[in-house]
Amino acid sequence: MSRCLIIINPVSGGGAARRYALDLQWKLSTLFETIEVKFTRGEGDATRFAKNACERGFDAVFCMGGDGTVNETVNGIAQGGFSCTFGFIPVGTVNDMSRALGIPQNPTQAIRRIDINETRTIDIGRCNDRYFCNNIAAGVIPKVVDEVTPKEKSILGPLAYFLRA
């Protein structure tokens, strides 16, 4: 029996992730026999959910959110032994990894493009006890990312990071 976990950050994209959740669930239900959906409520949830799914033998973990949700999910899969296929739908402010991979920024288009038979291998790095898949930053960048509020991201979009710097 093929199983897939969907992790949704309901505040990503000003609540856009919640709006597209059913579309993603429907699409993945055509590819997997069992779908489980979990909504994050705070920091660390996506990591915990992904790790648990891998440990329970799920075939895939998809997340819907921004770069932070993607990073947390990748960390959970890594901690779970890299045993799951990973997919994501970009619904954040910047969506850096999806841009690098050529994934459509429009969630509907990204969902339509999901094909479990067309996967790619991506490199995963590790720094201390954290994993990363797209970039790693030091100095002012992580400080700025931490300081930008969800309200600022919602109102200003990517400009919020520039103004905080």
Where do the language-model regions lie?
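Short, glycine/acidic-enriched loop or turn micro-motifs at the edges of active sites
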Residues: 12, 70, 93
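Catalytic core of DAGKc-family lipid kinases
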Residues: 31, 79-165
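Helix N-cap/beta->alpha junction signal
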Residues: 42, 65-66, 137
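ATP/NTP phosphate-donor binding region
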Residues: 1-61, 75-76
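A glycine-rich beta-strand to alpha-helix segment
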Residues: 59-64, 68-69
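Glycine-rich beta-strand-to-loop/alpha-helix junction loops that act as flexible
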Residues: 10, 64-66, 91
